[in-house]
């Protein structure tokens, strides 16, 4: 099997002190870039998609293409549901072959978040599907969900301990100062809070909103317990920017096989950098 659960790769990362990158993809070309680059660098890989991505491309198509690419490169990977909110939707995608899930109930009150997450864990663990959940809220935009900065909430360390114990999740996404989208100013990550969470929680910790973070912040976060790093916006900007530039310079261009090449090359450089920042080259 080339489509695997994220549980084992995150535990290995936790034990060996690096992080696994989770790259958000949208179509054939972006899938090709992340799988090919990870395979060339022998890096563990999580291919992530939001509900919007799976609606756009089709869950069966994403799983099938990811499986074929993984097989052709002899490179097992996890296909991951990013920021999913409904158990019925998760059940459908697990049935289609997904083996890694993030259930996001962070917008609910604490007790309701626990109840929702536990229902997903109880279902997914029957099928060896790993489950990530979020406690605290990141600012910014993910799919059609927009969280204003004033509504962003940092993860409370003691609540994190209770949350993990009561839900049985495999990994915990925490809020320590990152945000979805690009930063207008350099973010100030709360590393002290991260340390306090790590002291209370033994599951792998996840950092969302890593696009544009300085390498030093990613490296320090990993040294303090982050085991999975999510990148989305930075990939889209590199891909679309190179595509726009090519079409501006070649107004007559009409062949996707030509104008997708520079877009993929630009995105590949971001993937390579993130893998280097995560310290996971050669860790497959």
From Swiss-Prot:
GO molecular function, one term: tagatose-bisphosphate aldolase activity
SUPFAM superfamilies named among the record's database cross-references: Aldolase
Superkingdom, taxonomy of origin: Bacteria
Binding-site list for dihydroxyacetone phosphate: 181, 209-211, 230-233
Pathway annotation from the record: Carbohydrate metabolism; D-tagatose 6-phosphate degradation; D-glyceraldehyde 3-phosphate and glycerone phosphate from D-tagatose 6-phosphate: step 2/2
Named cofactor requirement(s): Zn(2+)
Keywords associated with the record: Galactitol metabolism, Lyase, Metal-binding, Zinc
GO cellular component terms, semicolon-separated: cytosol
EC annotation from Swiss-Prot or TrEMBL: 4.1.2.40
Keyword Transferase: no
InterPro entries assigned: Aldolase_TIM, Class_II_FBP_aldolase, FBA_II, TagBP_ald_KbaY/GatY, TagBP_aldolase_GatY
Function: Catalytic subunit of the tagatose-1,6-bisphosphate aldolase GatYZ, which catalyzes the reversible aldol condensation of dihydroxyacetone phosphate (DHAP or glycerone-phosphate) with glyceraldehyde 3-phosphate (G3P) to produce tagatose 1,6-bisphosphate (TBP). Requires GatZ subunit for full activity and stability. Is involved in the catabolism of galactitol.
Subunit and interaction comment: Forms a complex with GatZ.
PANTHER family linked: D-TAGATOSE-1,6-BISPHOSPHATE ALDOLASE, D-TAGATOSE-1,6-BISPHOSPHATE ALDOLASE SUBUNIT GATY-RELATED
Recorded family membership: Belongs to the class II fructose-bisphosphate aldolase family. TagBP aldolase GatY subfamily.
Protein's recorded name: D-tagatose-1,6-bisphosphate aldolase subunit GatY
Organism: Salmonella heidelberg (strain SL476)
